[in-house]
UniProtKB/Swiss-Prot annotation:
It is found in: Cytoplasm. Keywords: Cytoplasm, Methyltransferase, rRNA processing, S-adenosyl-L-methionine, Transferase. One of its GO terms (cellular component) is cytoplasm. Residues 315-337 are annotated as: Disordered. One of its GO terms (biological process) is rRNA base methylation. Its EC number is 2.1.1.199. Gene3D superfamilies: Putative methyltransferase TM0872, insert domain, Vaccinia Virus protein VP39. The keyword Transferase applies. One of its GO terms (molecular function) is rRNA (cytosine-N4-)-methyltransferase activity. SUPFAM superfamilies: Putative methyltransferase TM0872, insert domain, S-adenosyl-L-methionine-dependent methyltransferases. This is Ribosomal RNA small subunit methyltransferase H. It comes from Xanthomonas euvesicatoria pv. vesicatoria (strain 85-10) (Xanthomonas campestris pv. vesicatoria). The lineage of its organism: Bacteria, Pseudomonadati, Pseudomonadota, Gammaproteobacteria, Lysobacterales.
Length: 337
């Protein structure tokens, strides 16, 4: 098995390529190109008749893709979220799809993108800086309740109400425009503890997920991926936190396992599985963690499409799967409220 270029270390590189089982003349889609580590691995296994489609909503990632692969006739490059992959490929035409979720290392490492609480920069956090509100814009106009709900729902931040109150109070005095401003403010109102985790970690995660609609895009992308795969095609998804992994795990199980029967309801149409689980949760081993510590939280799940089964992907069902930031924060959560 080939190894990735030293300049960029993609997470679970070998496991992803093993999971996708790339064939010489297959068609594959990388929905989160990033800096192209996984895409290069797929391309190495493709012959002249193979095809690779890459997507990313980050214009910097697209620029890297065009520089790296622009002259390769096997590669087509598309700027946009993987939630819209159904507009890029027709149904049942793809042999393998990879979704590597969350924020990429280059996005974290560049202070100007505004993702990192450890590097001072403009408070942006948009994966696509040309669309939508920045984090600074959202924090400037969101209500205290909305901020608290987002911090609790997407960050599981126990001090969500206390932090939201502090943000609203501070913005009345001066706008929050820098990542260091927000990180320092959060740290100043958090209870002292022994945790090695930065006190702003959960809040930055929550705001980023909300700004980029990450979980809604994940839901839409999973449905679109299932439609796009051929029978025998494989879906590989890498998640980095429990909210993402829970959605992926439940999605794959929904189409691989019959739901529990209910004797009180009329007998349903026999369940025909659409997916077969190829693996459970795959995590980085010690050797990879020594090289790439950021892989510690990565979880890879792989499933194979079997054929046309019974699907239930209506809007009502999807709405049950996405955490709702308007759900009430339990009274036991937050500060001494």
């Amino acid at each position: 098995m080939s190894q990735p270029p030293a300049a960029h270390v993609p997470v679970l590189y070998t496991q992803v390529l093993d999971g996708l089982q790339v064939t010489e003349n297959g068609t594959y889609l990388d929905g989160t190109f990033g800096r192209g580590g996984h895409a290069r691995g797929v391309l190495e296994h493709l012959g002249p008749g193979g095809r690779l489609l890459v997507m990313d909503k980050d214009p910097e990632a697209i620029a890297v893709a065009e520089h790296s692969f622009g002259g390769d006739a096997r590669v087509s490059i598309h700027r946009g979220s993987f939630a819209g992959l159904g507009q890029v490929v027709a149904a049942a035409t793809v042999d393998g799809i990879l979704l590597d979720l969350g924020v990429s290392s280059p996005q974290l490492d560049v202070a100007g993108r505004g993702f990192s609480f450890g590097k001072d920069g403009p408070l942006d956090m948009r994966m696509d800086p040309d669309n939508g509100q920045s984090a600074a814009q959202w924090l400037a106009q969101a209500s205290e309740r909305e901020i608290a709900d987002v911090l609790w729902t997407y960050g599981e931040e126990r001090q969500s109400r206390r932090i939201a109150r502090a943000i609203v109070a501070r913005r009345a005095e001066q706008p929050l425009l820098r990542t260091a401003q927000l990180a320092d403010l959060i740290a100043s109102v958090m209870p002292r503890g022994d945790s090695k985790t930065h006190p702003a970690t959960r809040s930055f995660q929550a705001i980023r997920i909300h700004i980029n609609r990450e979980l809604a895009d994940l839901e839409a992308g999973l449905d679109a991926a299932l439609d796009a795969l051929k029978p025998g095609g494989r879906l590989a998804v890498i998640s980095f936190h429990s909210l993402e992994d829970r959605i992926v795990k439940q999605f794959m199980a929904r189409y691989a396992k019959a739901p529990p029967s209910n004797r009180r309801l009329p007998e349903a149409q026999p369940f025909v599985p659409t997916l077969q689980l190829v693996s459970g949760a795959i995590k980085a081993d010690d050797a990879e963690l020594n090289v790439n510590p950021r892989a510690r939280s990565a979880v890879l799940r792989v499933a194979e499409k079997l054929g046309v089964g019974i699907r239930n992907s209506g809007l009502e069902e999807r709405s049950k799967r996405i955490p709702n930031p308007q759900s009430p924060i339990p009274a036991s959560q937050g500060d001494a409220q």
